[in-house]
């Protein structure tokens, strides 16, 4: 292991304690009936054989750990390499959806973990993977066409310009409108707080993509899975660079970036992320009132439902 176990354990414990304090300070640890205060067991995978629980967050090392959980379920590496079936579909054949009650019981006898990522880096990754590089004839390709028709000037007249792919700025206009109108968000950019309700569950390990190699090495060690799965990150080469962050977020105004902060506010605050490196690359708003309005904006987060139709696009 690249660092001694004690140092890694201390870092992970600090994250866990930080999350508990933040949950309490934000009032998110109090059970209720809305999506932020009600346990959401929908995206959890529970390995009863290995006593391991994972809340799958799309665009946060999800491909790697979906592969790992399929290995734990008994699929061979050779089968997983050759099959045309979607990894999530395979996983759900072995790991049924949990109820609140069954997941609570599993937490009492398992090691539970969550992998998080900077909210705006995750958002950009979702855009690049599912919109910019959408597969032909896919739901995301259809969504991209709809975004262009709505947000690109003259597109309705057949003038798409140089690109038939939505720009990041066009995608963000779509996302902001979705939230303002209370529409369903795609799972690849739904806030983690909505997905995994981390204040409602006592996760043992909160891994960050920034330190993923060490975090998952420690996780595999704690779960006793050395020799069963490997601490790999399958899409690490596709990670978002600082240059890409500047390239894409410089298309947005600072008011828009602040609006995004409000959408992902709890992901920022619960997992100790900031706007450093994002807000400063945004375009200065011509109207100071727009920036002031964004700063004073009430939280935009609304109830998001889960859309199974997107489950084929992991």
Model-found features: residue ranges?
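Membrane-interface amphipathic segments in extracytoplasmic regions
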Residues: 1-314
């Amino acid at each position: 292991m690249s660092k001694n176990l004690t140092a890694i354990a201390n870092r992970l414990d600090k994250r866990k304690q930080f999350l508990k304090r933040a949950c309490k300070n934000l009032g998110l640890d109090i059970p209720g009936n809305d999506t932020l205060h009600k346990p959401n067991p929908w995206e959890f995978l529970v390995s009863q054989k290995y006593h391991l629980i994972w809340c799958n967050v799309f665009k946060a090392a999800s491909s790697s750990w979906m592969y790992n959980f399929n290995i734990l379920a008994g699929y061979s590496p050779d089968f997983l390499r050759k099959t045309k079936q979607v990894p999530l579909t395979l996983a759900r054949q072995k790991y049924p959806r949990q109820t609140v009650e069954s997941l609570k019981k599993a937490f009492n006898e398992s090691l539970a973990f969550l992998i998080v990522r900077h909210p705006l880096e995750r958002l950009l990754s979702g855009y690049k993977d599912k919109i910019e590089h959408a597969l032909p004839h896919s739901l995301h390709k259809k969504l991209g066409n709809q975004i262009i028709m709505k947000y690109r000037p003259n597109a309705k007249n057949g003038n798409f310009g140089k690109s038939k792919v939505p720009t990041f700025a066009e995608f963000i206009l779509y996302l902001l409108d979705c939230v303002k109108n209370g529409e369903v968000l795609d799972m690849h950019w739904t806030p983690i707080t909505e997905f995994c309700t981390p204040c409602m569950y006592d996760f043992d390990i909160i891994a960050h993509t920034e330190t993923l190699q060490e975090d998952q090495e420690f996780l595999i060690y704690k779960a006793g899975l050395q020799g069963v799965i490997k601490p790999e990150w399958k899409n690490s080469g596709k990670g978002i660079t600082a240059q890409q962050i500047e390239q894409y977020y410089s298309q947005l105004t600072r008011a828009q970036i602040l609006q995004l902060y409000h959408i992902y506010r709890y992901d920022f605050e619960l997992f100790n992320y900031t706007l450093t490196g994002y807000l400063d690359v945004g375009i200065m708003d011509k109207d100071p009132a727009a920036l002031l309005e964004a700063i004073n904006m009430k939280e935009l987060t609304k109830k998001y439902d889960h859309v199974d139709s997107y489950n084929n696009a992991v």
